[in-house]
Amino acid sequence: MKKLLLLTLLLCSAFLCQAQKDRIILGDEQTSEYFPILKDKKIAIFSNHTGMIGDKHLLDVLLENKFNVVAIFSPEHGFRGNADAGEHVSSSVDSKTGVPILSLYEGKDKKPSKASMQKFDILIIDIQDVGLRFYTYYITMCRLMDVCVEYNKKVLLLDRPNPNGHYVDGPILDMKYKSGVGWLPIPIVHGMTLGELALMVNGEGWLPGSRKWDLAVIKCKNYTHQTKYQLPIPPSPNLPNMKSIYLYPSTCFFEATPVSLGRGTSLPFQVYGHPNMTGYNYSFTPRSIPGAKNPPQLNKLCHGVDLSTMSDEE
């Protein structure tokens, strides 16, 4: 009996050790790699609620270690991740730390002002993307890349896995249709992490004038494009779980139509419907909720299809 118990304990220990060995280590967890770079620097961060190192935000970790964080740039949905899609997020102050949150869209050029850019020496990027051409976080990153080149600022990108990084799909964007929901000549599902995409932007000369930026990327460890990565935190209000993230590349196209895609429900991008789509057994009613204050077909009974029961493989 004792031998059996000992064998069981040894097997469990071996499994735990292997699991720890195979665990994906995010860029921001590798503090020994980037803390020396930050010494004596005035730091700005481009992040939001996803920029977590374990149970602490990158901002809090930097401040606890006495680094001089002077500014925050936040993307669509804001630094705390609770603003609506497309909602203008103005300059403010982070209530928890007192660090200024600077606007990304100042003046006629819709980019950070000269005064904002002169506040810091180095920009840290730590944000969770989902690997789609129309997901706006990478577009904000590209805008910041451009202005960092203009003001000769170094950029440190702490990379994270791409939850849709196991495949590439869709046509490459015709750049005459470049917009706020399509910024680079890449497929709809591009398969890259933000770090890989940033390196590609540099390598392909995609910044205006083919300018290069001073970029360092702290890559993930134990991550490959065959790795199935479950996001620990929803990246935005209407992508609350992996089902929404997996369906988003397909269902998002219908946002240009009057059809509701479940914004204002518990199943955003997992259902679709319209008041006039009679004949379907499934129905739902979009409501005003945080992250979807005024969703399409607000307070109207929509008939349609529930995709939430599909398997991830489908």
Q: Residue spans of the language-model regions?
A:
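Bacterial Sec-dependent N-terminal signal peptides
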Residues: M1-D22
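N-terminal phosphate-binding or glycine-rich loops at protein starts, especially the Walker A/P-loop
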Residues: R23-F67
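Internal helical hairpin/lid segments
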Residues: N241-E314
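Glycine/threonine-rich flexible loop motifs
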Residues: D129-M141
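Glycine-rich oxoanion-binding loops at beta->alpha junctions
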Residues: S90-F120, L132
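Conserved anion/nucleotide-ligand pocket segment
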Residues: K178-T251
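Short internal beta-strands
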Residues: N68-H77, L158
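Glycine-rich, charge-decorated loop segments at or immediately adjacent to ligand/cofactor-binding or catalytic sites
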Residues: G81-G86, L156-K178
